[in-house]
Amino acid sequence: MTHQYPALTTEQKRELQDIAQRIVAPGKGILAADESTGSMAKRLNPIGVENTEENRRLYRQLLFTADERMDKCIGGVIFFHETLYQKADDGTPFAKMIKDRGIVVGIKVDKGVVPLAGTNGETTTQGLDGLSERCAQYKKDGADFAKWRSVLKISETSPSELAIMENANVLARYASICQQNGIVPIVEPEILPDGDHDLKRCQYVTEKVLAACYKALSDHHVYLEGTLLKPNMVTAGHSCPTKFSNQEIAMATVTALRRTVPPAVTGVTFLSGGQSEEEASINLNAINNCPLTKPWALTFSYGRALQASALSAWRGVKENEKAATEEFLKRAEANGLAAQGKYVSSGMDGSAGQSLYVANHAY
């Protein structure tokens, strides 16, 4: 029976939509700085920096203390639990520092992927236990949005019906719990770029996965205006012999979204999925210039694609902090322009052109 039991009050809905709109205001996107402690090792070890709490704090500090140029192109920052409770050198909590700049604070709330028995190496995401209490606490501590990542992969046998259904359901349950606590959920069903599949296959799988997600969100009475979607762009697999143009990637991506994502959704914040910094900006720009009608904000939620050059410039040396912050700002501004279809690429030179692909990427 389709009886309606109101899940949210008008005030709650208004607050959620307002938060979502602030994050994806024109020319703004998200800095994903929510790498787990283990993932930070993969960032710091290659540049010769020990993965300690203090080094992680110093690194995040150089991102968060970037000058006012950041405020024009970053609408939200996703924190990891540890970072939410860290402070800058002057004693200001990072969360307060970001909030005071008019940037929305977010928090990663999932607890990582676990194997889904009976599938060929597929996964589901854990973290629903105690999520409501954690969300209530995070809201008190300054967070207004959250992120939960589900992972699907393309192969002969996957994604299976089971993996699609289970991940859609867990994302919807998470989204519902967030909204009850005044937190805007970012729904992230990432289809990994591993494999030799072509653009068509990725588009087809992306459509099936997104359709399942929005069916589940509807079943769970999630208020779509108070959500954001964080999908992969539609690209061929990394081992695909055929190379596709930025325009082809944009057309396949926007077509998949138009077929599955309701216009009520406030914004789509793409993940970079191991693309190089430059590639992630060029593709986002092409998506915004795609000649199809696009009812949502189409912007970025990038981790590596905003940070790779900054990390290389920093190398853990205090004297390099300024240069590292400049590299971060350069990418942030590039993506702010790309989110408006106004980015002009300066070529694929240097570290910005280096692929950031990691096979079977786990955060």
Curated annotation (Swiss-Prot):
| Catalytic reaction(s) noted | beta-D-fructose 1,6-bisphosphate = D-glyceraldehyde 3-phosphate + dihydroxyacetone phosphate
Please tell me which top-level EC class this enzyme sits in.
lyase
Q: Which residues cross the membrane?
A: none
InterPro entries tied to this protein: Aldolase_I_AS (IPR029768), Aldolase_TIM (IPR013785), FBA_I (IPR000741)
What keywords sit in the KW lines?
A: Glycolysis, Lyase, Schiff base
* SUPFAM superfamilies with a match to the protein in the record: Aldolase (SSF51569)
CDD domains recorded: FBP_aldolase_I_a
Q: Does the keyword Transferase apply?
A: no
UniProt note on tissues of expression: Expressed in brain but not in liver or muscle.
Question: In which residues is substrate bound?
Answer: 56, 147
EC no. given is 4.1.2.13
Kindly list the residues the record flags as site (Necessary for preference for fructose 1,6-bisphosphate over fructose 1-phosphate).
363
Q: List the GO biological process terms.
A: fructose 1,6-bisphosphate metabolic process; glycolytic process
Top-level lineage group: Eukaryota
One GO molecular function term? fructose-bisphosphate aldolase activity
According to its UniProt record, which residues of this chain constitute the active site? 230 (schiff-base intermediate with dihydroxyacetone-p)
**Which pathway does this polypeptide act in?**
Carbohydrate degradation; glycolysis; D-glyceraldehyde 3-phosphate and glycerone phosphate from D-glucose: step 4/4
Say which family it is in. Belongs to the class I fructose-bisphosphate aldolase family.
Record's subunit section: Homotetramer.
What name does the UniProt record give this protein? Fructose-bisphosphate aldolase C
Which species does this protein come from?
Carassius auratus (Goldfish)
Identify the taxonomic lineage of the organism of origin: Eukaryota, Metazoa, Chordata, Craniata, Vertebrata
